[in-house]
Amino acid sequence: VHNYHLDWQNLLGVCHGGSQPNVEDAEERFSKRKIDRSCDVPKGGKPINERILNPLEIPADVRIYRYAAHTGRMIVDEDTCPPELVRKARNTIRELNLNAPRLMRMRREAIMVLEDEIENALAAGVEMEEFLTILAENFLLPDDNGNCQAFFSVIRWFLGPAAENVLSKYGYAI
């Protein structure tokens, strides 16, 4: 019997989707509510791999999703998502419950951090375009330990062209 939890090709198997109480920041990341479960939890053992995006095959140089800033809702960005991926991108949101209230709340919080950073910089007289590039570098590039910020796709969407310029500069090799 194949053990999918140990299979690198099954990257979704590593996310417990809010179902594990013994995680860092459990008060934020864990929920007893079934509606809050995402990723591997709703996927379970269902054979949906042909209907959803494979994380190993998503092109790095295009943005697939956009977000509603006031709700944190994830939406396929039909302006930037390649047409041949739109159906699978929608299925991915639905099948993995990527609009679980827990995830939407966490996305809103990430957006609010960026909004606060921008508001503070503007109040200090910093030039907006320059600051967006600084934010993109600080929030999208790995830190000294090689770790990236949570909600990379949200940050990428929010920072728009500044994010795309930084990612392009680094050859999307993040």
Residue spans for each PLM region:
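Histidine-centered nuclease catalytic patch
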Residues: 1-35
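Generic detection of intrinsically disordered/low-complexity segments and helix-coil linkers/edges
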Residues: 2, 59-61, 125, 151
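A generic structural signal for solvent-exposed, polar alpha-helical segments
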Residues: 14, 71-73, 163
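A broadly tuned preference for mixed-charge, low-complexity surface segments
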Residues: 24-47, 121-136
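Conserved, surface-exposed functional patches that form binding/active-site neighborhoods
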Residues: 33-119
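C-terminal, charged low-complexity interaction regions
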Residues: 80-174
